[in-house]
A protein has these predicted regions:
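Membrane-embedded beta-strand positions in outer-membrane beta-barrel channels/transporters
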Residues: 160-162, 211-213, 276-278, 312-314, ...
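Outer membrane beta-barrel
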Residues: 102-132, 144-298, 307-309, 316-319
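Residue-level detector of the transmembrane beta-barrel scaffold of outer-membrane proteins
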Residues: 115-117, 173-177, 223-225, 288-290, ...
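N-terminal periplasmic/intermembrane-space "pro-region" immediately following the signal or transit peptide
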Residues: 2-14, 21-121
Length: 482
């Protein structure tokens, strides 16, 4: 293909040179040739324009005409190239052209852009937890208990392939967005990508279709999103977590599913990917807000029918660093959702709010995060959010994190904890009181796409009755983004 392109490019140049030695009507053929080479993608816009400009600067062949007044011959002015070139430009249908995008992996078809982005990762993980004894039993605990285990698995991120199709119609920027998140580990039957793993032969991995949404907006209007995408509450907590690139707490390591836990339930509640209708404002300086209505989620373990949607909102502020100086990203978000009663249990309303900030200077970063809620549970939204009588439990959590870059190396460390309270009349039990973890991480940027990562995670789970469990995990592998 490259050889063909060079050959045709040479032919175009030869045709161009021939213009000066052929009659004027041959210019039409040259214009047509250049146009066809551009339409087929052999000539880029820049190459086409350069050849056209070069052609226009060359003197056109001119016939001598008699000088009626002096009996001599004269040469007329050079205006003959303008007509054929203008005609060629008018014949060009820009919507038939396929162009390479300025950035990313994708292409432009007329007014429509198609962009692909994605990631693949894999890690060797060795997880060593406490023995499975009664004193180590914690209901809702995330520290591993049982035999030492090894696995080759995904980290907190599964793989993903995202496709964005965008254009402008009638002054509106519109887009269709699809995100597929396949894992490398085998799953159990039809339990879904986030179900239990099954490390046996003749099994297949799952695909998590997390993102399916449309967008439309204008620069001065903002953007409307309709479909399934990441939530607003607690989304910045996970997106700024260093374990997002690696493994973190490796729950279920003996039979891994699509993802590890990272710091989910160990400093923040998982935001989740949810059906929603969300409006995001334009940026006012560095300030932006978003609000949305969401598919109401049921209490995990109950199957109530909820008559009202959930509501979430977020405000962010960005200070972009200049010349490696000080930068900041700060956020506050919240959610409210009413749960209707079922089977004699009362209705309740879950509420939560969080706030966080990531500060950066040169190659150093510091992140702090905190959340508090009632009736929202821990680990995932509305998991363990009420007691057996339907009364709301309170919960909170935090994490702190620091990073330092040295050339292609980045070192990071973090600590976080999530706490779940008993209700006033709830008996003491093995119910989880807190999950916490320490993380140490080292990264090396092998290429612009590939990062090598090594990580150590210590996880501790404590129950309200005093039970306690601990585990250590070592992970080493790589992640690729494009």
């Amino acid at each position: 293909m490259i050889g063909t392109a060079k050959l045709l490019g040479a032919a175009a140049a030869a045709a161009l040179m021939a213009v000066s030695a052929t009659p004027a009507h041959a210019q039409d053929a040259t214009d047509e040739l250049l146009l066809r080479l551009k339409e087929k993608g052999i000539l880029t816009d820049d190459e086409y324009n350069a050849l056209v400009a070069r052609k226009q600067t060359q003197p056109a062949p001119q016939a001598a005409v008699p000088n009626q007044t002096a009996g001599a011959t004269t040469v007329p002015g050079n205006n003959s190239a303008e007509g054929p070139q203008q005609a060629a430009a008018e014949r060009l249908d820009d919507k038939k052209l396929v162009r390479m995008m300025d950035a990313g992996v994708g292409f432009q078809i007329g007014d429509v852009g198609v962009k692909f982005s994605g990631s693949v990762n894999g890690y060797y993980v060795n997880d060593n937890g406490d023995k499975a004894l009664p004193r180590n039993a914690v209901a809702g605990g995330l520290a591993s208990v049982g035999d030492n285990s090894s696995s080759i698995r995904n980290g907190l991120l599964p793989g993903f392939l995202k496709v964005d199709v965008t254009t402008n119609q009638g002054g509106w920027d519109v887009g269709a967005h699809f995100g597929l998140y396949p894992g490398i580990n085998s799953g159990v039957g039809n339990s879904g990508a986030n179900g239990a793993g099954l490390p046996q032969a003749l099994q297949t991995s799952g695909i998590d279709a997390r993102q399916t949404y449309l967008t439309f907006g204008k620069p001065n209007f903002g953007e409307v999103k309709i479909g399934r995408d990441i939530g607003l509450f607690a989304s910045d907590a996970i997106l700024n977590d260093i374990t997002l690139l690696a493994v973190g707490t490796a729950a279920g390591n003996a039979a891994p599913s699509n993802t590890s836990l990272g710091r989910i339930g160990l400093g923040y509640i998982y935001t989740d990917f949810q059906p929603q209708i969300t409006y995001s404002s334009p940026k006012f300086g560095g300030l932006q807000f978003a609000v949305g209505i969401f598919q109401p989620l049921t209490t995990i373990g109950r199957n109530e029918v909820n008559g009202s949607p959930g509501f979430q909102g977020k405000v962010t502020y960005d200070l972009v660093p200049t010349d490696g100086g000080f930068g900041a990203h700060a956020w506050v978000s919240g959610l409210v959702q009413k749960h209707d009663g079922i089977d004699g249990l009362p209705s309740y309303t879950g509420r939560a709010i969080d706030l966080g900030a990531k500060l950066s200077y040169a190659n150093f970063g510091l992140t702090g995060y905190y959340y508090t809620g009632t009736g929202v549970g821990t680990i995932g939204l509305f998991l363990l959010s009420t007691d057996a009588a339907g009364r709301k439990r309170d919960s909170d959590g935090f994490y702190v994190q620091g990073t330092a870059g040295f050339g292609k190396f980045t070192l990071g460390a973090s600590y976080g904890r999530s706490t779940l309270d008993r209700t006033d009349n709830e008996p003491v039990s093995e119910l989880v009181k807190s999950n916490s973890s320490y993380v140490g991480q080292a990264r090396y940027g092998l290429t612009s796409w590939v990062t090598l990562i090594g990580e150590y995670t210590y996880t501790r789970s404590r129950a309200h009755n005093g039970n306690d469990a601990n585990s250590d995990a070592l992970a080493a592998g790589a992640i690729l983004f494009f």
